[in-house]
Regions:
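C-terminal and late-domain segments of enzyme folds
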Residues: 8-15, 19-23, 110, 115-302
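Short beta-strand segments
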Residues: 3-4, 58-60, 172-174
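Functional beta-strand-loop-alpha-helix junction segments that form "active/interaction loops"
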Residues: 7, 23-47
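Solvent-exposed loop/turn segments at secondary-structure junctions
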Residues: 6-9, 35-38, 63-66, 99-104, ...
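Catalytic nucleophile loop
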Residues: 58-61, 83-108
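Glycine/threonine-rich flexible loop motifs
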Residues: 64-77
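A short, aliphatic-rich alpha-helical micro-motif
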Residues: 51-52
Length: 302
């Protein structure tokens, strides 16, 4: 079943998915649930039972807020979301694509850049600068999920989200990549072309008092294609070479630091502005893991 509620063009998106699946010999149906019709569709008992009996449910990409507001209609759990939960309990696979992957978490990142998250913290509303966090669908409570980690420099906002919500782990998915979780989300196998990053916050060292945000020894662990993440231990069993993972992680962190702090170095050169409110220091272990020290002085009026 294809649920394209996250898409701005749900009918067209669902058709594209169904066409692609049929090209692989897989039959699929458009569940035809959108934010515009969910108040009516969630009352259709036949649809609810149809969803509960599905073996695979694909939540297409798009705006994750639109998806969540369709299944948690006006803040309430809909019969449609309960039907998806029933299907999952019976062994169905739930596939979250792009933004829909973020919606699978208990806490969902809905907006904001890494710089805004570090500089302003959690936004009080969508109209302000900062990190937007909303309730997610809760199918993947093990970690907060974020995606497009490289192109959008989202590693920083993922770390801030975990620290702010007291969630130990964050899972960042790189472009054209994902993870396959086992039945209880305790083991994740990285798939695709690039991989994923496991972010681990140390709650005993994290400080959120006043305008200061301090998260030292934030552990980063890169999982390349085929690597298996153990969510209980926070470790990775590697199939891909550690040297490749180390290079990929070091590049991600370097891009984040350049994006949020700049490249002026310890001394500000003439005509170059260095961010005075954010400090990021990274210690690479050379094996696809490392530690990121995060400090920022926040402006609460963003």
């Amino acid at each position: 079943g294809v649920l394209a509620a996250a898409s701005a063009e749900p009918r067209a998106t669902a058709r594209n998915y169904i066409r692609a699946l049929r090209g692989k010999g897989v039959e699929a149906i458009d569940l035809r649930v959108t934010i515009g019709n969910v108040d009516r569709r969630m009352r259709e008992e036949a649809l609810v039972e149809q969803i509960a009996a599905l073996r695979t449910i694909i939540l297409t990409g798009g705006n994750q807020i639109r998806l969540v507001e369709s299944l948690l209609y006006r803040g309430d759990v809909t019969p449609l979301l309960m039907a998806i939960a029933r299907a999952r309990s019976a062994g169905a696979m739930i596939v979250g694509v792009s933004g829909a992957a973020s919606a699978l978490s208990g806490f969902m990142i809905g907006g904001g850049t890494s710089y805004e998250a570090l500089r302003f913290g959690i936004a009080s509303d969508m109209g302000r600068h900062g990190l937007v966090i909303q309730e997610g669908l809760g199918f993947f409570g093990t970690a907060i999920i974020d995606q497009k980690l490289s192109s959008s420099r989202r590693l920083g906002r993922l770390a801030v989200a975990c620290a702010e919500e007291g969630v130990r782990y964050g899972l960042g998915l790189l472009e054209d990549s994902g993870v396959i979780a086992n039945h209880d989300n305790s083991q994740l196998t990285a798939i695709g072309t690039r991989g994923a990053v496991l972010v681990e916050i140390d709650p005993l060292k994290t400080e959120l008092a006043g305008d200061d945000f301090i998260a030292p020894d934030t552990r980063l662990c890169f999982a390349g294609p085929g690597d298996v993440i153990d969510m209980a231990a926070g470790t990775v069993t590697r199939l891909a070479p550690a040297t490749d993972s180390a290079a990929a992680l070091d590049t991600l962190v370097a891009e984040l630091i350049k994006d949020c702090v700049g490249s002026a170095g310890p001394v500000t050169a003439p005509g170059v502005t260095q961010e005075a409110h954010i400090a990021l220091r990274y210690r690479s272990n050379g094996d696809g893991t490392g530690y990121l020290d995060i400090e920022s002085i926040r402006d609460r009026h963003g």
